[in-house]
Amino acid sequence: MHQVTSCIFCSIIQGNAPSVRVYSDNEFIALMDKYPVNYGHTLLVPKVHYNDLLSMPLDLVGRMYCLATNLAKAILLSIKADGFNLGQNNGRAANQIVPHVHVHIIPRYNYDSPNGNWPSRKVASLAELGRIAESIRKSIAEPLSSGYLQ
């Protein structure tokens, strides 16, 4: 599996950096964003390092977005959000901070941005993130057993 030693996501995948995982399979991990826009903000990351979406095989891109959609359903169910944003940035000009492909699944609530701007990012403790992740994992468990995430 191709990894980059200076990449925070590769370090997390290898178990060398802390994270709060929501989901993991052979190809992807989903983890809580440490600085969430809203609580439940989850990052879906391929386990193989790709700098951007254009460097990923198309079949893997398709699987990533199918999984992102299913994770979004579990997130909405678990934290009672009103909607969600899927975000994926490619390159510095597009505000890609970590040069490892990832999809942001951001729960949204009616009136969470009354002035039309994004809500401010929060700083969440690992304990807070762990509680939210557990709730999301419970929402994944039933759909997973019925083939929902496969």
Predicted feature locations:
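HIT superfamily nucleotide-processing domains
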Residues: M1-Q150
